[in-house]
């Protein structure tokens, strides 16, 4: 089976644990997107933080003369293309658009949110239950992770799993 090298947290906790404004905002997001706990939210905040850091660094490097500037432009196009493929940025986006992203842009691309928005479940909590119980498939493959990031090309391929009893009945 093998030994895992190192387990690292995929999130960072807030620096001030009892900031009232942050706690209220986080609670609203947890309720709106049906998250199980705030660690799920912090994970997506960390992903956003990484993309914003990359965008800031690339904006600084693009201004450099010579080959460094050209390499930075190519890296910028790669990052923008990746976020576009995920469905977070539009086709003609720039690095400034990455800096304007919010954590809600990433939370909207979760499978749980997509199942609810497409009407396969009545509530966001029911969408999570359908996914964890194995009733939802993406491109014909069963996905049991509510935090699965749905790309633009897979967005139209979300459906009930073919062997699921829910596929044979009308849920909504």
From Swiss-Prot:
SMART domains: Ribosomal_S4, S4. One of its GO terms (molecular function) is rRNA binding. GO terms for biological process: ribosomal small subunit biogenesis; translation. The keyword Protein biosynthesis does not apply. Residues 109-165 form the S4 RNA-binding domain. Keywords: Ribonucleoprotein, Ribosomal protein, RNA-binding, rRNA-binding. GO terms for cellular component: small ribosomal subunit. It comes from the Archaea. Belongs to the universal ribosomal protein uS4 family. Part of the 30S ribosomal subunit. Contacts protein S5. The interaction surface between S4 and S5 is involved in control of translational fidelity. One of the primary rRNA binding proteins, it binds directly to 16S rRNA where it nucleates assembly of the body of the 30S subunit. This is Small ribosomal subunit protein uS4. The lineage of its organism: Archaea, Methanobacteriati, Methanobacteriota, Archaeoglobi, Archaeoglobales. The gene is rps4.
């Amino acid at each position: 089976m093998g030994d895992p090298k190192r387990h690292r947290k995929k999130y960072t906790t807030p620096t001030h644990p009892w900031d009232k404004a942050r706690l209220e905002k986080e609670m609203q997001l947890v309720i709106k997107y049906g998250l199980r706990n705030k660690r799920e939210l912090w994970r997506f905040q960390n992903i956003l933080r990484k993309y914003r850091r990359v965008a800031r660094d690339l904006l600084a490097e693009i201004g450099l003369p010579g080959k460094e500037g050209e390499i930075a432009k190519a890296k910028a196009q790669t990052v923008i293309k990746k976020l576009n493929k995920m469905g977070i940025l539009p086709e003609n986006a720039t690095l400034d658009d990455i800096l304007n992203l919010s954590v809600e842009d990433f939370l909207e691309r979760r499978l749980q949110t997509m199942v609810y928005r497409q009407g396969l479940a009545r509530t966001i909590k029911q969408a999570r239950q359908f996914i964890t119980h194995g009733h939802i498939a993406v491109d014909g493959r069963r996905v049991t992770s509510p935090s699965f990031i749905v790309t633009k090309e897979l967005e139209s391929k979300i459906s009930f799993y073919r062997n699921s009893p829910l596929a044979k009945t009308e849920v909504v």
